[in-house]
Amino acid sequence: MSTTTALPARRALDSFAILLMIGLCAIWGLQQVAIKTTNATVPPVFQAGLRSTIAAVLVWAWARSRGTPLFRDDGTLGAGLLAGVLFAAEFVCIFLGLTLTSASRMAVFLYTAPCFTALGLHWFVDGERMRRIQWLGIGVAFLGMALAFADGFLHAGAAAGAGAHGSTLAGAAGDALGVLAGITWAATTVVVRGSRLAHTSASKTLFYQLTVSAVVLLALAVGLGQVRVETVTPLALASLAYQAVIVAFVSYLLWFWLLTRYIASRLSVFSFLTPMFGVTFGVLLLGESFSARFLIAALLVLTGIALVNAPAKRTA
């Protein structure tokens, strides 16, 4: 059997897709702030499970209103369940990893995802081959993202090295979970782009992921004793509404719609902007600090994105 999958050709990004991806990354970056502001009242895994549950209901209602079938047998069940499991596994790895390593180190390892996405698409999906200049762009963007979090990354590593041997091993395990989260994120994109899901509606693709992840995450929350809400505050309700309606429903639906029309590897590199937006919103809304190094890092990320999306030279 061939290792590649022939699918309808996707096109390079136009100005609309670029602006939409920047907007989506800003939404995802603000989500980091929303989660931070709610963690004290709603445990993170329970938050994620509630988010997926609410968003799944919204996707069902949206599909029903548009007459989009979600339960018709179209041969996507296997790929849909796999994508859902991978989607849930990403959040499980992030949660468990953050109990063992720092947020900065998790960010660096999690955002290896665009690198793994590019590799997976290059190997398994026709029409997603990347040129050398595009691989350079991936590397430059990742370097910029890593530079943005270098202080926290190195500080956490030094602290672990100065601690007990067990702390060092725990930190390494947390880092490994960060990489695994990046791999599962990338694998989700590859499954969606390289299977029958590429031929189905964005609503159905998202419904698979939300329903499976809701079951997995809520079950994990029960197992961890996290099914509780300390205090119902307006801020907590607003944060959960933002995560469920804006992020998990609207932005993910738009993301999967983009995957049906544009080259996935060129879209995925924009995700390097997400932690940059997260830092920016943290500075603006939470009063967090940042250094001049962050501006250099942002420039590197933008340069890398430009290289990945640079048009190929036409031959006579």
Q: Which ranges hold each PLM region?
A:
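Membrane-interface interhelical linkers
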Residues: 1-23, 55-82, 127-136, 153-173, ...
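Transmembrane alpha-helices of multi-pass small-molecule transport proteins
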Residues: 2, 16, 39-89, 112-120, ...
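Residue-level signature of transmembrane alpha-helical cores of multipass secondary-active transporters
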Residues: 20-21, 25, 79-84, 95, ...
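Transmembrane alpha-helical core positions of polytopic small-molecule transporters
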Residues: 25-29, 83-91, 113-114, 149, ...
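Specific transmembrane alpha-helical segments of multi-pass solute transporters/efflux pumps
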Residues: 27, 31-34, 60-110, 120, ...
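Specific alpha-helical transmembrane segments that line the substrate/conduction pathway
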Residues: 46-57, 86-87, 95-134, 138, ...
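Helix-helix packing/entry segments at the starts of transmembrane helices
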Residues: 48-50, 106-112, 191-214, 244-284
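Hydrophobic transmembrane alpha-helices of multi-pass small-molecule transport proteins
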Residues: 59, 81, 112, 119-120, ...
